[in-house]
């Protein structure tokens, strides 16, 4: 249909940054004031995602942004930043191109769901 997708919260409110895989939010972090987000997270998935990234010499940010950018329907990745170095990191984060094996491994970590809406 020629539609594009603009993913909102490409880092899952920060869960895909690696900062929260221990299950605790660092003081002053965005999720420190939103404990319900971290409480609902699957920490095993977050740790497996971090392992996946490190095995490839990447950061979680690079994997998340690059995977999204590699999707044909994705027209852009919304990349918020609170510090200047984050702008640079975000811009450089889409250089990795996942292989079919990488995509299969990510599907094992985050199995596709049947329904993504609340209705």
Question: Model-flagged regions — what are they?
Answer:
Residues 1-52, 116-119:
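Glycine-rich, positively charged active-site loop/lid region within alpha/beta enzyme cores that binds
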Residues 4-7, 69, 108:
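Compositionally biased, intrinsically disordered/low-complexity regions enriched for serine, proline
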Residues 10, 38-95:
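Conserved short secondary-structure transition element at the edge of the structured enzyme core
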Residues 15-16, 71, 86, 109:
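Short secondary-structure boundary/hinge segments and terminal tails
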Residues 21-22, 82-85, 111, 116:
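Flavin-dependent oxidoreductase catalytic cores
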Residues 22, 86-91, 104-105:
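Short alpha-helical linear motifs
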Residues 28, 32-33, 78, 94, ...:
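Short amphipathic alpha-helical leader/targeting segments
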Residues 97-118:
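Extended hydrophobic/aromatic segments used for targeting, binding, or gating
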């Amino acid at each position: 249909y020629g539609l594009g997708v603009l993913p909102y919260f490409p880092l899952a409110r920060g869960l895909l940054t690696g900062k929260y895989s221990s299950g605790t939010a660092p003081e002053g972090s965005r999720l420190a004031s939103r404990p319900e987000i971290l409480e609902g997270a699957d920490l095993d998935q977050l740790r497996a995602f971090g392992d996946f990234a490190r095995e490839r010499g990447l950061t979680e940010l690079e994997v998340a942004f690059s995977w999204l950018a590699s999707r044909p329907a994705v027209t852009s990745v919304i990349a918020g930043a609170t510090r200047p170095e984050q702008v640079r990191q975000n811009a450089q984060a889409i250089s990795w191109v996942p292989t079919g094996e990488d995509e299969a491994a990510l599907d094992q970590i985050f199995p596709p769901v049947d329904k993504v809406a609340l209705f």
